[in-house]
C-alpha cells in the first residue's frame, strides 16, 4: 500500500479532482467529530479518477490498487447501492 505524499490535510487546498477532494473532505470531517476512520471505499469510477490523478502527479510507482492518506486506507470495491464513497470505521473498544 502506497502513502500519497505531499497532501497536508491541515491546510488542504482543492486539487481539482473530485476523487481526492472527496477523500480529503471525508477524512477532515471525521477528524472534526473525533471519529476513527479506518478506510475509504471508492466505487470503480471514482477510484479510476484517483488512480489517474496519482499517476499524473506522482508517476508510475503510484499506479497501484490501494493507497493510504493520513493513515486512512483508500481502496476500490464494487458498490451496488449507487453511492460513490463508503466509510469504514475502527470498532470501539470497551473499557472495563
Regions found by a protein language model. Give the residues of each.
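Extended, solvent-exposed, turn-rich assembly/linker loops in the middle of proteins
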Residues: 5-39
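Extended oligomerization regions of viral-like shell subunits
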Residues: 32-96
